[in-house]
Amino acid sequence: ELEQRERDQVLVQFANRSCSVLVATDVAARGLDIASLAAVINVDVTPDTEVHVHRIGRTGRAGETGLVLNLASMKEMGYVGKIEQLQGRESEWHKLDELTPAGDGPLVPPMVTLHIQGGRKEKIRPGDVLGALTADLGYTREQVGKINVNEWSTYVAVDRAIAAQAASRLNAGRIKGKSVKVRVLED
């Protein structure tokens, strides 16, 4: 069981592409709003068809494409049929032993999230963080990802290759003229 602060940090990391896979319960899945979600994998089929369709709707939003994989037992086929009826299309089926991995290495996310102690209360804005990383420290805009400024803290995604150095340099530097504490959120 995660505390709310830990849950928020995990969700920020996932949304920032600092975490490749997020495993969530049905309760957690209902509260997620993450853009460009490539895939949803269900380890069971929800008996409530509307809830299941809402859950898998987390992928392929706003005209984007996404993949939904349902791991279904024979006992759940009735639920699958109802989902197919609601969506107006049939599912594509594969036996589990026919599936092969796409690669042989681990899923390494391209970004790492930095946690900055300081947020809206300190009048920090996303542009201030971007400016500190690009203009002050010389990183490129392409090396900086999503920036989330909350009341007391800020999260910024940076390219994995520069994460440790960027955190160290931000700790030694300033954002908006103020010293800040920065740490790398661990995978």
Name each model feature, range by range.
Residues 1-187:
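Conserved helicase RecA-like core
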